[in-house]
Amino acid sequence: MSIIKTEHLTHIYSQGTPYERAALQDFNIEIEEGEFAGIIGHTGSGKSTFIQHLNGLLAPTEGKVYIDGEVVCAGRRDVGRFRLKVGLVFQYPEYQLFGETVAADVAFGPTNMGLPPEEVEKRVRESLRFVGLSEDMMEKSPFELSGGQKRRVAIAGVLAMDPKVLILDEPTAGLDPRGRDTILGEIREYHEERKNTVLLVSHSMEDIAQYAKKVLVIAEGKPAMYDTVENIFSRVEELTAMGL
């Protein structure tokens, strides 16, 4: 069953002005539930615009987006429901930390979902385990942690909401190779244990090849290819022509 589906999705920035630009054009894709898919494309191809439609941060100019069979539309009263289903981790998410303690920061999402305190605490502990942070970190201030640890706390805050779809936009940006491998390994472990759908946006073809099972290639606002890692990376000439 498709957990993500778009039909003729088009998004035009600054429509009706001299600065009008089509970021997505007649974008049609279906992604199966439980998939671990990498998303690649050169700068300006439409990657970020696409993922922001999946939890209603952006509304389509034309077309529809479906999550778990339901239409998503930014501005709808119940768009918050989709943001519980679709967890989005932006680049440098550590800049969004605000809790006095690590535990408070990670607990923010599930607490606002109305979950009982014992369930919130359980989710906080599980999420920190997934990102490789020990329980003795829970009462520390997130602002005293290293850059890599802050990144993991921010990711844990999204995992604690247990989204059906987890989207990570360049989650290892700015990290050293060791930190990058650690975080991506933890995300893979999370996927294998929870069986949730994971979309990983990355400029690193190496990371996509190592961790994803399928690859969505976006070019000029459209899905140019969507297939297994092996099949995509065998099309070297086409990828090179797209600047990848």
Regions inferred by a protein language model and the residue ranges of each:
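Conserved ABC ATPase signature
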Residues: 141-145, 149
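Conserved beta-strand-loop-alpha-helix hinge in the C-terminal portion
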Residues: 222-243
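ABC ATPase NBD Q-loop/coupling interface
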Residues: 64-81
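Conserved ABC ATPase "signature" region
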Residues: 118-136
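H-loop/switch region of ABC-family ATPase nucleotide-binding domains
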Residues: 202-203
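A short, surface-exposed alpha-helical micro-motif characterized by mixed small hydrophobic
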Residues: 208-210
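Helix-to-loop junction immediately C-terminal to a conserved catalytic motif
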Residues: 55
